[in-house]
């Protein structure tokens, strides 16, 4: 998994849309998700404005991050920015964790709908990070599901729209 995450890191950081982005939303990886600490630190070192999700009850906001070592465990035991961290309203790009994806950009998350609610109406470019083994032929979708614009795996960078 770590080797695949490093390959994904390399592909993400070479994307033109990433190099041109000033504000980037990412996520704190847990479990078997694509690991993001290296990606976050790379963005911070490049001088980009980076924010991570913070979940409170049924709402998710993105809050600015300057140092991943200062995150604290949140509602789902996921490292998050502290409550007093400024909210980042708009993003050029958001990197999104995916349990499953299809090549059309349909995504399976954890089933709570936090990302779909947050991304509704967002002008950010949505990039789903996933391992190639998690790409399937089709994902069932509902009217509230938000598609990814790009998918990045250890093998491919796929533009879906």
Segments the model singles out, each with a brief description of its role:
Residues 61-161:
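Conserved phosphate- and dinucleotide-binding cores of soluble alpha/beta proteins
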Residues 1-87:
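N-terminal active-site beta-alpha-beta segment that forms phosphate/nucleotide-binding
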